[in-house]
Amino acid sequence: ESGGPHRALGNLYMELPFFLGGSGDQSVYHLEEAVRLSPDYAENHLGLAQAYYAQNNFVSARKSLLTLLRLTDNVAEDEDLLNFRTQGQELMKKLTHD
């Protein structure tokens, strides 16, 4: 179990405009559930960090990003994990400027 359904719903709520049903709160809820169900799945932490960042919850975003970076510390051969790590590093840079 990777928390996939909750991750998908969380990403959907984050990407949809409000008038089409988008909701930052619903996004965070589903991504928190994905992390709860699969705390060692890096993509869940990236999505949750992005949702927190979108809500200006920078402390929680940083916490999720630190977990993501820890989970992807030695992943030189896995392209997906390298991509998640790179996205996380880019978001962390934004956090240091906000």
Where do the PLM segments sit?
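TPR alpha-solenoid repeat register
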Residues: S2-P5, N44, D78
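Short coil/turn linking the two alpha-helices of tandem helical-hairpin repeats
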Residues: N11-G21, A54-N56, A76, K93
